[in-house]
Amino acid sequence: IQESYLSANPVAQIRQKSKFLRKQQIQSKIRRLSPLQWDFVIDTAEAMAAEQPQVHERTLFVMNALFAMYLRISELVDTSRWQPQMGHFQADQEGNWWFLTVGKGNKEREISVSDAMLEALKRYRLSRGLLSLPIPGESAPLVHKTRGKGGIGSTRQIRGIVQKCFDAAAQKMRANGFSEDAERLSAATVHWLRHTGISEDVKHRPREHVRDDAGHGSSAITDRYIDVERAERHASARQKLIK
């Protein structure tokens, strides 16, 4: 009896009934800023830079870089494996600018630099007393310390820079009657800026281009940011009649 009992493989029996199992879990929602929240955030960063350029031109550059180049927070700080420098902005023979970084999994990648991001870089560099554009091999730190020399070496410091901007933007949103949006912004993290940049660009750029700039391992990851079809699907269903 015992031998007959053991011959029945419970795992195999479960697999035989696999048609009753869910084949795909609902993917977690991408956390990102709404267009309204981003408008308040970047406007706030620009206002902060105008009021205290010695401190907040850096804030404005950090916000632009996280959004426009989909950077992870670790890609802005000095680490034992990578020290981001101005010379990592490089122009090719056609005059196109790229940013070289080492990201997740110690993988090196090139990020295409938009005209708007290039202008943001020029503004930041001029505020630091540098030439408007980097020269090959330039070793100046990408995100400088306001006290002392060298680049920022702690993700905590970057979080502090971003959080200060988020808090100020949320305060402005409340003052303008956007209380719910302000509360959601108060819960945002630095990584939301990367998600926001990807989500906006994937609406009008080829997904393969966004995938490579973001450093995604596959297009399936990038596809998670595409919600235009989902919105259109719901809009087409909204006026369906039952009777």
PLM features per residue range, with description:
Residues 115-184:
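Active-site/catalytic core of tyrosine-dependent DNA strand-transfer enzymes
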Residues 1-15, 71-74, 165-172:
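N-terminal DNA-binding recognition helix of tyrosine site-specific recombinases/integrases
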Residues 50, 159-212, 219:
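Short, basic (Lys/Arg/His-rich) helix/loop patches that form interaction surfaces
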Residues 5-43, 148-149:
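Flexible interdomain linker/hinge and immediately adjacent N-terminus
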